[in-house]
Amino acid sequence: MQQLTPMDAAFLYLENESTHAHGTLVWLYDASHCEDPGVNRRALLEHMRSRLHVSPIFTRKIHRLPLDFDYPYWVDDAGFELLYHVRELSLPQDGDWGDFCQLVSTVHSRPLDHNHPLWELTLVPKLNDIDGLPPQCFAILGKFHHVAIDGATGMQIIEAIHDAPGQQQAEALAPVRPARLPSLGESLFRAAIRNVGALDKGLELVGLGASPRPDNTEIAEAPLEEVTSDPHQEPSGIPQTLFNQAITPQATWESRSFDLARIKAMRQAVKGATVNDVLLTIVAGGLRHYLQHREALPDTPMKAGCPVNIRTEAEAAAGGNMISAIIINMHTDIADPLQRLQAITRSSSAAKQRAGARGSRKILDVVDVVPAQAQALLGNLVGKVAGKMNRAVQFNGSVSNLPGPQQELHMLGGRLQSIGAAMPVMNGYGLFVGLTTCAGELRISMSSSANILPDPGKLGDCMEHSFKELSSAARKRPATKRKSTKPGAAKSRPTRKKS
């Protein structure tokens, strides 16, 4: 039995009827090298039965205490049933990429049941006739609650449930033995001890405690405007966009793939640019084109909240969430793609420098000192207030670079070829762009809700247009002095079949 950390619990408390704190990973497999892949629900059940032991998240569930007077506990699920967690859905016989994206949206829209372990796998076989995908393609949708994993720990679990070349067969799972929950008196005592410790830490954070102030106080206390803006520009506000309004329970999702080698080559066009800067530039261009299409492009540049992993090596095995965020100016007001890349390179560098180690962990420190009952009340209040405000407060949308596998992975005989990500959105923050890499491919996935993004395919087209714009401009500009990467040929994206 393990108690949730304050940061993990926050993802539970933020949930409501329209906001669900889970992510859905979209794994696409190439089974064209197999004569009979044997891709069906029974095979997936057998495979997962042999991998349940790789992480406790597969067999434990959440136990919340009365009135949320302390943080919830992870407890073993004595009635665990694997059949509940492994499912299968199929596309229509003539289904295309748009139909597949709609299926992902539907699966992602359904909340996870807290009476069970917080994960599901959904098999989607026979994606054989979708342009741009292998002739023997299938997908697995892995839905996991954010209370259990973040991007870094999630990739560890993904690699553990897949097969890798030369990997030994996994050991069998030991029987589940439920742990005893603490009594009401024990829970009250633990909550009291925790709150006393949180009070001391809170006093320390505001400078009233006995502990010495850190050397990098200046960084930790840098106001948000300084962190989010260029060092040579006046801070600007957060524009209100069509993405910043109340969401509905029905999710929408779209994803497009690009050649990672070409993206790496684009950074040569601007001195100091990183791959992440190139990706942010492509995303910003896509958003600019889409908002122009909707006649809703703001004059003030949009801001993106970018999650960052802040766990140390010693904390790497702890699981759960240890994340913070930096906020970066996306410069959506700049039409020229190379000028936009230059501006984003400066902005991202300034944001990273100002958000030092202590500054990045400050969100985690603040969450740690808020008692469980207050967190639960605040989480409910935030959702209601944001739903009525219909406006952004800190940033316009999230852009997250999720780590990809470092080796070739297989499942049910298929080689993992591509990874997409459907991510959670909430009232006031109705856009989440996930960036994932796998097997030399970079995939840009866009998550929103149906009332905000009724035409996700159009936003996907705009991302492709932005990629082509930047690629063309980068080729015409002499490369800066750094080790070059030979551009590869652009990959074709899955497209809708013509009727």
Locations of the language-model features?
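Acidic, low-complexity proline/glycine-rich segments
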Residues: 6-18
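TRNA-binding/sensing appendages of the translation machinery
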Residues: 18-23, 42
